[in-house]
Amino acid sequence: MRTAFVIVAAAGALAAGVGFAQSGADVLKAKGCLNCHETDKKKVGPSFKDVAAKYKGDKGAPGMLVGKLKEGTGHPKAAATDEELKAAVGYVLSVK
């Protein structure tokens, strides 16, 4: 009985943890990225669609883009956690 309780409690904790992660779209909105970028047209910065097209098929793109956002090279330094940056970059690269 105790084993079953532990398994159920662990599964519940894992499921609850997933709900706390912000989606990439939420991060982009919360961090002000939409002030300079839009999904499908150039604003101050390139559109997410153009960024996704540029890096399509580039397996190193997610890490490189997260690095650029963290360091602020050619782009203002992002005030976000690594998890938030990965979610945002993942979302941008998925835009079609």
Predicted segment positions?
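Sec/Tat signal peptide C-region and signal peptidase I cleavage site
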Residues: 14-21
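Sequence/structural segment immediately N-terminal to covalent heme-attachment motifs in c-type
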Residues: 22-37
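Hydrophobic helical h-region of N-terminal Sec-dependent signal peptides
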Residues: 6-14
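Positively charged n-region of N-terminal signal peptides that target proteins for export
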Residues: 1-4
